Amino acid sequence: MTVEYRLAPEFPDPYPVEDSYAALVWIAEHAADLGDQDRILIVGASAGAGVAAGTALLARDRSGPRLTGQLLIGPMIDDRDRTVSTTQYEGMPPWDRNSNRMGWTALLGDRRGTDDVSIYAAPSRAVDLSGLPPAFIDCGSAEVFRDEDVAYASALWAAGVQAELHVWAGGIHGFDFMTPDAAISRAARAARDGWVVARHLSSR
């Protein structure tokens, strides 16, 4: 199912994650009619992957529906603008440091980069990642989100959470959407599909 959560700046934090969590609760309550209640996977790309990661944290902290996995494609998860990759690709399309600041400001307003930011809005701020569902994280090597995504995967491993990380050589942000027939895009889709099948669709 696709969740049409409300978008910033008209609906800033916490609307996107709260909408996504409400949808997750509804899906879990109707899982018998929709599919398998024991195999609920959350997926997102870019800002949507940040919402997915935040929703996974919220589900854990509210003892909400159990997720079997989180598939995060180029997730936007850190508002603090401190990594090497945020400066390394400044001025380079399709999404650079200025775009990133604009996006975070739309979501957080004047709170961007301050201590007054929730882990559900910016999951990289979470200190405790234990108890989260297994994760698949990928990004391009030539994108702003690279370092925060690698750091998040490392933090998941440190917390004892199963995670699979792919950094696609030469990939820019959204490379698989812009060049779907390129070899790198086909490889990325195959890796994602393989993870979903192996962990969530195979018979138990």
Model-found features: residue ranges?
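Alpha/beta-hydrolase superfamily serine-hydrolase fold, recognizing
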Residues: M1-R204
